[in-house]
Curated annotation (Swiss-Prot):
High levels in liver and kidney. Also detected in heart, retina, ovary. Lung, testis and brain. It comes from Rattus norvegicus (Rat). The modification N-acetylmethionine is found at M1. The keyword Amino-acid biosynthesis does not apply. It catalyses: L-kynurenine + H2O = anthranilate + L-alanine + H(+); 3-hydroxy-L-kynurenine + H2O = 3-hydroxyanthranilate + L-alanine + H(+). Its EC number is 3.7.1.3. The keyword Transmembrane does not apply. Its cofactor is pyridoxal 5'-phosphate. HAMAP family: Kynureninase. It comes from the Eukaryota. This is Kynureninase. Keywords: Acetylation, Cytoplasm, Hydrolase, Pyridine nucleotide biosynthesis, Pyridoxal phosphate.
Amino acid sequence: MEPSPLELPVDAVRRIATELNCDPTDERVALRLDEEDKLKRFKDCFYIPKMRDLPSIDLSLVNEDDNAIYFLGNSLGLQPKMVKTYLEEELDKWAKIGAYGHEVGKRPWIIGDESIVSLMKDIVGAHEKEIALMNALTVNLHLLLLSFFKPTPKRHKILLEAKAFPSDHYAIESQIQLHGLDVEKSMRMIKPREGEETLRMEDILEVIEKEGDSIAVVLFSGLHFYTGQLFNIPAITQAGHAKGCFVGFDLAHAVGNVELHLHDWDVDFACWCSYKYLNSGAGGLAGAFIHEKHAHTIKPALVGWFGHELSTRFNMDNKLQLIPGVNGFRISNPPILLVCSLHASLEIFQQATMTALRRKSILLTGYLEYLLKHYHGGNDTENKRPVVNIITPSRAEERGCQLTLTFSISKKGVFKELEKRGVVCDKREPEGIRVAPVPLYNSFHDVYKFIRLLTAILDSTERN
């Protein structure tokens, strides 16, 4: 699931420290890492929030003209600067030529989604005809489950991780109820072992092996929203197929974050949103994938006009010519204004490439982990200082850019103090603070400054 072997983050930090004749925690290491960063120019493609504009900022603690430390791309990505330009292009076209905009221009409205789908294929590792840009994530999940979840008396379960994102949980629960099944019997959730935060792959594979004959669909998140755990998508897919199950994934926290190869991994179906790592703005246009092997066998349960072949769509004879594959699942006219914001971001990804972004991300988050463990690891019974625990897996192949932190003191106070100092992250129940340095627009110096602020907050808490 990873690019070719590369220098481990801790080794890179120590190498640079040796070259500079300084401690690995020195600020000069962060600055050198930024100098060596081949992707640093892409930060200029985004608007970075200023300290003065943040609602929870304490201006007595910061320089109001400084950029915020924005570590929340796992919730909402920053705005690409070209979004306004692309929106204005379509608004101007609408104003000047009205309905002619459906057929002319850079993004003809009738094929607005299709005009940018080629930019998505390398991000998810799929053929163009396997991808549709439409709707919102949970809408797409419902549409996909209506076609892939066909329970029988013997094979009636959907397998998912416990504490999946609520929207996934509700969607699966309601799909089971739609078929008149008992949720308690047909919704199979895998929990971490007692005392552990994340799932072990061997436990997932064991459940699939033992219960697979009764499982209709295996449906996991690609990367867990709370723990930050990246699941082994090809291994889960292979195990599910060996037992005759369809295998699908919610890639909300994986797309644009880690490398994906949905076609080569033989995933049956997947869906994702675009407002996190894909930076399309709140409620942005979502995506869906169906493997080409299902193009002529899996049909949409609900059909609309935009699932009809374009070549005969305007014959108006009400004789459906369904587009094979996932594009037959499209129901309505693509929302061109949402297409614009996604277009602006996908062009940046095309220039940066997922392989290069992932390589930087491994180093960036590894540097964050190194500093956290250096300053705030250990056992609070030994040193009586507040301790930061990282519940996200330490191995790069088992996580994306996000680290989920828990504290030996109340997270609410820590979070409030971070906000006052211009750190944009979030807290998630029950105990986590999520921080996600994004390689497109975050720097190693951002990480260094975050650690300085966190350390000052925890030191102050200790003194008080």
